[in-house]
Design a protein with these regions (language model features):
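Gly/Ser/Thr-rich phosphate-binding loop
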Residues: 93-98, 107-168, 180
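Conserved ATP-binding/catalytic segment of the ANL
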Residues: 189-194, 198-257
Length: 257
């Protein structure tokens, strides 16, 4: 019999700073994440999900599919994003998961009107930073505020703007329930509120390690069990997170980044 700690999937990272690595995600990692999101994003039996994401990363393969499956709601799956087809489907769905370019392309379509969106409960964005101007333009266009969230291959979803409450452009919101986030310096010391450092995380969503790479796995975790994301971030006094870049992609000039 399979248990929560048994490996359910190996999903390969994008390999931003080297060769791609196979992140081992357990049944517990995936189920805990989906159940948390179903509650956090308020899914009910009345929802219908529109899914036009590619299924080679966690957003499309796990987050969207698992939320629909575990809540038992219909999902309209499109093999690829097409503005005209999304517009045709919108009248029969209540939730859409997308990436920022989906929303900019929709706003360019003449048939994507404010009236078309009035029944929509939620537009979710992730997988790439949502520009503040896109957030504001979409609200002006539709009257709906996109909910931005943050995740990665090694932990699926990690943080989210609130369903109820203020969604601030340029931020990814707060740690998911059960997930602990901290922003640290190179010695893994927590930085002061508002200062930039590397985002670290611990929780039931965090993967079991990299496939056949024990040394790499060990180097990516702190002694107290936090995964070192490699993403540079800030956190305010309320715990709201802003992603500002990648650790290894920073350009240092005159000692400043």
């Amino acid at each position: 019999d399979l248990g929560a700690d048994d490996i359910a999937s190996i999903i390969y990272t994008s390999g931003t700073t080297g060769r791609s690595k196979g992140a081992m995600l357990s049944h517990g990692n995936l189920s805990s994440n989906a159940l948390t999101l179903i509650d956090l994003w308020g899914f009910t039996e009345n929802d219908v999900l529109l899914h036009a994401l590619p299924i080679y990363h966690v957003h499309g393969l796990y987050v969207a599919v698992h939320c629909a499956m575990l809540r038992g709601i219909p999902m309209r799956f499109l093999p690829r994003f097409d503005s005209d087809e999304v517009i045709r489907q919108l009248s029969s769905v209540t939730v859409m998961m997308g990436v920022p370019t989906f929303y900019t392309r929709l706003m360019d379509a003449p048939k994507f009107t404010r009236d078309l969106c009035q029944h929509m409960r939620l537009f979710i964005s992730g997988s790439a930073p949502l520009l503040a101007q896109t957030f504001e333009a979409f609200f002006a266009h539709t009257g709906r505020r996109i909910l931005e969230r943050y995740g990665m291959s090694e932990a699926s979803m990690i943080a989210s703007n609130p369903l109820e409450g203020e969604r601030i452009a340029g931020t990814v919101g707060f740690a998911l329930p059960g997930v602990t986030l901290r922003v640290c310096d190179a010695e893994h010391r927590t930085v002061a509120t508002g200062e930039t450092g590397v985002l670290q995380m611990r929780g039931p969503n965090v993967f079991k390690g990299y496939w056949q790479m024990p040394e790499k796995t060990a180097s990516e975790f702190t002694d107290d069990g936090f995964f070192i994301s490699g993403d540079m971030a800030t956190m305010d006094a309320q715990g709201r997170v802003r992603i500002v870049g990648r650790e290894k992609d920073l350009v240092i000039s005159g000692g400043l980044n």
